[in-house]
Regions:
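Short, small-residue-biased leader/transition segments that mark boundaries at the very start
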Residues: 1-5
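Class I S-adenosyl-L-methionine-dependent methyltransferase module
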Residues: 6-102, 106-116, 126-130, 137-144
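Short acidic, S/G/P-rich loop/turn micro-motifs used as interaction or catalytic elements
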Residues: 126-131, 159-161, 217
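Charged helix-capping and loop-helix junction motifs
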Residues: 135-140, 167-171
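Conserved beta-strand signature within the Rossmann-like core of class I S-adenosyl-L-methionine
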Residues: 148-157
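Short beta-alpha junction loops
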Residues: 156-162, 189-192
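Rossmann-like AdoMet/SAM-dependent catalytic core
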Residues: 167-262
Length: 262
């Protein structure tokens, strides 16, 4: 199951945000063998050669193409789901897809008990602590699926250190209460971020990846890629701002945040 972006493919226009993001990444990653050999780099560089950036659902379909029985996509916006269906039809080979035009939190929670333990959930919202009309959040989806033994990968973002601290507390307390102590959580944050003011907006100033029930190899790769991204962005600029990053890891055993300037 996957929450989705509005579109499958984004047309690139060399905006400052895109220059700081995908263009900078592809240029710098080309010099690093691990990043250059990553599937993300290979798929995006191929698509970017035609001036297009692959969105989250498109990547999911291409990355998991040969390894799964089907995709389930949830979105409140019908247009987003129609875009997914169109993209799927244009692929030479793709597993069956099913779309659900409903609230993705309640929609996924409803079908979770009927899904196999081998299910992989990619949860890609913006606000993971925002309650829906029934009082449920995206983190509730992750904890419920994790307790059923399913693999989960959740993305979250923040614009200030205050927001980050609120989310860190929310995540660690929610997981602890659910009895989930084994997880991987890695954040990449612009050094330009401030405590309670937004000084610039390249799209997001800090983002985190929270993974549960993944293999030790996958958990290790999240940390490896995090360190690699910090390294290649060490001299980056976004407009007149410092574009360098630091990596913060939320410990999976003690629920203690460790700030690491790598």
């Amino acid at each position: 199951a996957s929450d989705v972006y509005k579109r499958q493919i984004y047309t690139m226009a060399h905006t400052p945000e895109q220059e700081y993001g995908i263009y900078y990444f592809l240029n710098e990653a080309n010099e690093d063998v691990i990043l250059r050999n990553s599937l993300y780099y290979q798929l995006e560089s191929e698509s970017m050669a035609n001036g297009n950036y692959l969105g989250s659902p498109a990547l999911a379909m291409k990355v998991l193409n040969n390894d799964i029985k089907g995709h389930l996509f949830f979105d409140l916006e019908k247009g987003a789901l129609e875009n997914i269906e169109t993209f799927a039809r244009r692929q030479a080979v793709t597993p069956p897809i099913k779309t659900f035009n409903c609230d993705s939190v309640d929609g996924v929670l409803k079908i979770l008990p009927s899904l196999p333990k081998s299910t992989f959930l990619h949860i890609d919202p913006y606000e993971i602590d925002k309650r829906n009309n029934n009082g449920h959040t995206y983190l509730d989806v992750l904890t419920s699926a994790t307790k059923l033994g399913m693999k989960c990968l959740l993305w979250y973002g923040f614009m200030t250190i205050n927001e980050k601290q609120v989310l860190n507390k929310y995540v660690s307390e929610k997981l602890s209460k659910a009895g989930i102590n084994d997880y991987a959580c890695s954040e990449l944050i612009m050094n330009a971020i401030k405590k309670d003011t937004v000084v610039c907006n390249p799209g997001i100033l800090g983002s985190g990846i929270l993974a549960t029930n993944l293999s030790p190899k996958s958990d290790a790769m999240i940390q490896t890629y995090s360190k690699k991204l910090v390294a290649i962005y060490k001299d980056a600029r976004y407009k007149e701002f410092d574009g360098s990053l630091y990596n913060d890891i939320i410990s999976k055993k003690q629920n203690i945040r460790i700030k690491r300037h790598l």
